[in-house]
Amino acid sequence: MNINIICIGKIKDKYINDGIAEFSKRMTSFVSLNIIELKEYNKEDNINISIEKESLEILKQISKSNSYNILLDLEGKEINSENMSKYIENLKNIGISSINFIIGGSNGVSKNVKNSVDMKLKFSHFTFPHQLMRLILLEQVYRWFAISNNIKYHK
């Protein structure tokens, strides 16, 4: 299974990079992981322009492949780790070999992105910094594959 994390901006904090490196290493036996960092347009005067520019970059990435696209979104579906593990197994069983997880920038994504994905996934009612969300997502991806492979990680 190919897992692509499509995200906006670069990670600036060492502790987040360290966590990302750790979970990336753990996943090598389960998946081929690719983290695609797109340009952050946060410095624009107009937030809507920033959102549109970042969203255009996301749309370019997801149109390049025949992947299943999952957007992390506050309006998405809430699902627990066990059921998400089953969901991914079902995707594999129907022939999907690549999943794009999309983390928008700090200002969110456009309606075009929201309308172009296969699933919107909500992690929590809480709001997380988008850079920290990358680490949280990688931990969960590892957890989902650990569950489906009967690895003693998930409790």
Curated annotation (Swiss-Prot):
Keyword flag Ribonucleoprotein: no
Originating organism: Fusobacterium nucleatum subsp. nucleatum (strain ATCC 25586 / DSM 15643 / BCRC 10681 / CIP 101130 / JCM 8532 / KCTC 2640 / LMG 13131 / VPI 4355)
Organism phylogeny: Bacteria, Fusobacteriati, Fusobacteriota, Fusobacteriia, Fusobacteriales
Binding site for S-adenosyl-L-methionine: 72, 104
GO MF annotation terms: rRNA (pseudouridine-N3-)-methyltransferase activity
CDD domains the UniProt entry points to: RlmH-like
Oligomeric and partner information: Homodimer.
InterPro entries assigned: Alpha/beta_knot_MTases (IPR029028), RlmH-like (IPR003742), tRNA_m1G_MTases_N (IPR029026)
Places the protein is found: Cytoplasm
Protein name: Ribosomal RNA large subunit methyltransferase H
Record-stated family: Belongs to the RNA methyltransferase RlmH family.
Signal peptide bounds: none
Role played: Specifically methylates the pseudouridine at position 1915 (m3Psi1915) in 23S rRNA.
